[in-house]
């Protein structure tokens, strides 16, 4: 059946929720690696930090490069499962299996064996995550041709992802890392990581299968099927995607917004700890508030995008985020007062949480609109390439931020061996977080200004596509 005709009816809520559920399992497993792998490998397995840093850095690069490759493979797959569901199903099981493998390293074996185990496990799980997530993301663009329903699909998907992040970073600390007679610090207990691995793999299986069965009636075939995958064709499709002005603006804008997110991830904890001298309870309150606002604001941003269109909604979100960064900089200047009244940081968390909420989901919806533009111009649909490239930019921005900020920490004389940093370092940490994020949001706002698609243009494109298909 014609893909455009197939997806013209409004989706059932059960389908949208079922699709979004897959992002919960993905978020659960990947956030476990982000939050706990370095500590597990260094503090529990006693591996050198330099080796683990090498593994993490190389895996991020591999993860980024493999995304567009997987997108190309998926775009050109011809299978009874469709071009996405074969990988969603196989990726679900392979992630669950390799995730358990990653967290089941014997402590008493040689260091080089532990390193090889961690190295191979990380690269395997990163590979299978790509096998799952790139076709999964592309499927989200194929479920509906409705301009506003696409925003709803991405909002629900984002809610699942952010919920997984909160559970892994906060709830798991209380549930799995309880002190025992043998391990007063629960996070040093090897069995705790095995238990989380069993739990996260089960979650991945349940949510991955939920997504598969909820969306299996939306199987699609390649609009133009390549009998043989070719490097020249792959490179050509990447070049075409980046030549497309509207996709290029999303790609670069999304890269900048995620650069701000990476800055928060790298130096956020440093700032909360050494600039504002907040304990784990206060940090948890602030970050928890930010995540919760981000989750509950998703439906609001869907309504805002419906009312003022997606581009205007994204720019509004960026402006609110810029205001949040300005607030943070003022709080850094008044850090001595904030040390006494950390509640000021909650106000910042609400503003930045609301502002960034739409930046998680709306650009993903906009990518689907640019693929319609591609089909009109070329007769091909390459959702896999487009979402793979978006993931590539996102992950490379993370890698760049980690690399640069590592040097920045040295430049501002951060000393990890002391609990109280000097005034210059305390101030500089807050400045890096607030000003660095602000500049990223400002650059993203400038880039998105050149995006041209809106609801009227996308609907006109879809009508022209339909006429071309009918005339064939």
Feature map (PLM): residue ranges:
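Membrane-embedded alpha-helical bundles of multi-pass transporters/translocases
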Residues: 2-472
């Amino acid at each position: 059946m014609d893909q455009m005709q197939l997806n013209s009816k409004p989706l059932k809520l059960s389908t949208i929720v079922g699709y979004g559920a897959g992002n919960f399992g993905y978020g659960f497993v990947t956030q476990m690696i982000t939050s706990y792998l370095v500590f597990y490998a260094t503090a529990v397995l006693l591996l050198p930090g330099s080796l683990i840093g090498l593994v993490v850095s190389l895996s991020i690069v591999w993860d980024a490069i493999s995304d567009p490759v997987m997108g190309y493979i998926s775009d050109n797959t011809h299978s009874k499962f469709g071009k996405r569901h074969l990988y969603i199903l196989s990726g679900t099981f392979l992630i669950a299996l390799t995730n358990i493998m990653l967290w089941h390293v014997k402590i008493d074996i040689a260091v080089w064996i532990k390193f090889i185990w961690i190295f191979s496990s990380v690269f395997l799980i990163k590979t299978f995550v790509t096998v799952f997530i790139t076709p999964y993301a592309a499927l989200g663009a194929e479920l509906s041709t409705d301009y506003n329903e696409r925003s709803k699909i991405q909002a629900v998907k984002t809610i699942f992802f952010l919920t997984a992040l909160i559970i892994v970073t906060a709830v798991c600390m209380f549930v799995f890392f309880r002190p025992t007679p043998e391990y007063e610090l629960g996070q040093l207990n090897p069995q705790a990581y095995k238990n989380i691995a069993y739990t996260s793999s089960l979650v991945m299986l349940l949510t991955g299968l939920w997504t598969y069965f909820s969306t299996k009636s939306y199987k699609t075939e390649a609009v133009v099927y390549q009998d043989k995958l070719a490097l020249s064709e792959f490179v050509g499709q990447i070049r075409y995607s980046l030549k497309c002005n509207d996709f290029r603006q999303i790609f670069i804008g999304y890269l900048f917004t995620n650069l701000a997110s990476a800055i928060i991830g790298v130096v956020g904890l440093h700032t909360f700890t050494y600039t504002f001298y907040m304990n784990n309870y206060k940090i948890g309150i602030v970050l928890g508030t930010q995540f919760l606002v981000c989750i509950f604001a998703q439906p609001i941003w869907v309504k805002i995008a419906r009312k003022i269109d997606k581009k205007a909604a994204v720019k509004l979100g960026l402006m609110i985020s810029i205001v949040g960064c300005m607030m943070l900089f003022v709080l850094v200047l008044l850090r001595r007062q904030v040390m006494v009244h950390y509640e000021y940081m909650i106000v910042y968390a609400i503003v930045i949480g609301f502002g960034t909420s739409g930046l998680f989901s709306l650009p993903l919806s906009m990518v689907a609109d640019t693929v319609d533009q591609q089909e009109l111009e070329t007769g091909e649909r390459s959702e896999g390439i487009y979402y793979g490239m978006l993931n590539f930019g996102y992950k490379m921005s993370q890698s760049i931020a980690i690399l640069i900020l590592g040097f920045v920490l040295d430049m501002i004389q951060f000393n990890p061996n002391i609990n109280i940093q000097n005034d210059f370092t305390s101030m500089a940490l807050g400045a890096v977080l607030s000003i660095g994020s602000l500049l990223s949001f400002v650059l993203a706002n400038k880039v998105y200004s050149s995006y041209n698609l809106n609801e009227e243009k996308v609907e006109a494109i879809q009508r022209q596509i339909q006429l071309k298909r009918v005339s064939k």
